[in-house]
């Protein structure tokens, strides 16, 4: 039998690569501990303690008083996510059919608003929808009368869609742009029409992008508070508004942390459900 030996030089190179990898991992681990793990621990700590630092469940006992607000937040998040999916998927699909240069240009335009400050984007929407905004100014000049486009639920959902739509488009586009066209051609050769190919080949294979987009849109929509304050006029109160008021106005960190803890658990459950649906997909999805 032949004996295989590894030269000392290869061992040294292999060890150096491992040491280099460990060294490069250190900053990420430090960053994760400082800005992810530590804040989560602080949230849990404040959620189960009172102002003196003693253990208590009184904060969690107040959660049922906010169940309707949590439910409303989930409903608004679902509505905004559904609209983003209905708008984002066709956009990403047709974008993936263009030339590479056109795709790069359009992707840049999609990402451009994301480089702007979130507050500026929301304020710009207020100037469009406000009573003296662009739309109502044009309507008044045409003697059609002004419309109440702000300080309502529709404006809040529109603000969510406007701010988070790129997070739906980009993951779906990323998957669709790498789609194996040979599978589509094979389905067409077997007699499938365009609708069947789209429903049973393209959509299943783009499922990872859909799930990523849904997650990236739903999570910030549920927890947002600035959009509701500016576009809802204080008439729409979501769980993010309650948490923000507990930390900023009421100075009740413990109740705010308890609500944040419940919201965090809700988000983890949603992510678990998404991962469950995504568990059967690999390399762009499966054909059903």
Task: Enumerate the language-model features and the residues they cover.
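Transmembrane alpha-helices
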Residues: 27-36, 82, 112, 162, ...
